[in-house]
Amino acid sequence: MARQPLAEVFGFPIDNFSSDATRHRTKRLCPFNNRVPNCTKDKANDPLGVCSVYEGGNPVVTCPIRFREKWLIADDAAAFFFPPDARWTSLTEVRLTDKNGHSAGNIDVILVAYDDAGRLLDFGALEVQSVYISGNVRRPFEYYMADPDGRSQLDWNGERFYPRPDYLSSSIKRLVPQLIYKGGILTKWHKKIAIAVDRPFFNTLPELP
């Protein structure tokens, strides 16, 4: 059982002191294909570099960029959207509009299948949903970052506002509205939508029909 909430900081476990992990912490880099080399979570000039937090000793992803590791989610989505021999590429943060031309938000990743001449054959939408946090995760993060070597074994038990995954808000306030609104538009277009979540969050969701 973890005594503190930080599972990964700037892409690495907090007790990983390899040269790569140290470089990412020092320079506040993101190793998971962010749109820029640095972490930009919360604030670009003072990023909250927490990728995942512990719950019961298991890591729970709290940053959507964390899902981009090696772009495995794109491979999985393409296998769901297209035939096995399809050629495809991807675009990130694509604006979605409704029938009136009003913004319906952004699609996290659009996967596009094309033929030998580069003509579009099909596409599908991939949405990524990390888990919201209740409590205050910046306090233990800043405490750790002030002295990673000396505080990698920090004990945060008993601290006020101990950060924990908020599965209910993540599903009701974010995931369900996305499925209804964006999913409704894509359904009318007869296009598929895939949702990437991690296992702990998935296990809290009701069974879908």
Task: Give residue ranges: language-model regions.
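Protein-protein interaction/assembly regions in multi-subunit complexes
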Residues: 114-118
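Intrinsically disordered, low-complexity regulatory regions
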Residues: 205-209
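Short acidic loop-to-beta-strand element that houses the catalytic metal-binding Asp/Glu
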Residues: 93, 104-113, 123-129
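Short, well-ordered loop/turn elements at secondary-structure boundaries
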Residues: 104-106, 119-121, 188-190
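Nuclease-adjacent, charged terminal/linker segments that flank catalytic cores
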Residues: 1-106
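Generic structural hydrophobic/aromatic packing signal, biased to beta-strands
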Residues: 63, 90-92, 109-111, 182, ...
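Acidic, metal/cofactor-coordinating or nucleic-acid-engaging core segments within structured domains
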Residues: 132-204
